[in-house]
Design a protein with these regions (language model features):
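N-terminal helix-rich structural modules
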Residues: 28-154
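Intrinsically disordered, compositionally biased glycine-rich interaction modules
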Residues: 208-215
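Short, surface-exposed acidic
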Residues: 96-98, 195-201
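Secretory-pathway/luminal and periplasmic proteins that interact with or process carbohydrate-rich
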Residues: 118-120, 196, 211
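Low-complexity, Gly/Ser/Thr/Pro-rich intrinsically disordered linker/tail segments
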Residues: 202-206
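Generic detector of ordered secondary-structure context
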Residues: 5, 77, 121, 179-180
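An amphipathic alpha-helical core segment
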Residues: 129-194, 210
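Bacterial Sec-dependent N-terminal signal peptides
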Residues: 1-31
Length: 215
């Protein structure tokens, strides 16, 4: 199953890596610690099953859990999280850094990134997140990832080149179709992302097992 769905694995592992770096950050002071705890608990379950999915791909032990059981739990977790995320958005809008802290704010973004089965919801969150970014209450680089995700999921050109795919030779990753490729690096720099060349290099190093030269 995993060999037939390499892009699913790439999405899982790439976002897992982002989550790990985010959780290393110190949580800023927050006015809604209970909401922060809820978001973090959702993220914990999210990452639990994505970590196990990564172990399966790397042919490492997952105890008594089978690949099918892990994938089922991963999908069920995403489905259950959707209802909680939707409730949070409906009640307070996008969780601001001042409300839930920097880590929980990023965790919320990460959870929304995983809601590809609900592109309309992702689009709704995107609009609210833009307001938060403009107010300094969410991170521009996170917004860039979600914007690209929404655009690609709705058949449009991405803006920041964050969504990747293997090239035709399967020797390197490349960004999925981007609008105004000439000014891509300027846009990436503006929101705090590295150049597309560095990003491609990082992807190739991180997911080298998917490249033809490593098989």
């Amino acid at each position: 199953m995993l060999k037939d769905n390499p892009l699913i694995f790439l999405t899982v592992t790439f976002l897992t890596a982002w989550s790990a770096s985010y959780n290393a950050m110190s949580q800023t002071e927050r006015t809604q610690p209970q909401l922060s705890a809820i978001i973090d608990s959702l993220e914990e379950q999210d990452q639990k099953w994505r970590h196990l999915w990564t172990l399966v791909h790397n042919h490492q032990s997952t105890g008594s859990l089978t690949e099918g059981e892990i994938l089922l739990n991963l999908r069920q977790t995403d489905s259950l999280n959707f209802f909680t995320l939707k409730k949070i958005i409906g009640e307070i809008g996008y969780p601001a850094i001042a409300e839930v802290g920097s880590t929980s704010s990023k965790n919320f973004w990460l959870l929304v990134q995983h809601q590809d089965r609900h592109p309309e919801f992702q689009g709704r969150v995107l609009k609210l997140m833009k307001v938060a970014v403009d107010a300094g209450q969410a991170y521009a680089e996170d917004y860039a990832y979600l914007l690209d995700r929404v655009l690609i999921n709705t058949g449009q050109l991405q803006v920041y080149g964050t969504q990747m795919v293997l090239d035709s030779t399967k020797t390197s990753f490349k960004p999925k179709p981007v609008s105004d490729m000439v000014n891509l690096n300027a846009r990436r720099k503006y929101v705090g992302l590295p150049s597309i060349e560095i990003y491609i290099q990082e992807m190739n190093e991180r997911y080298h097992e998917f490249l033809t030269s490593d098989k």
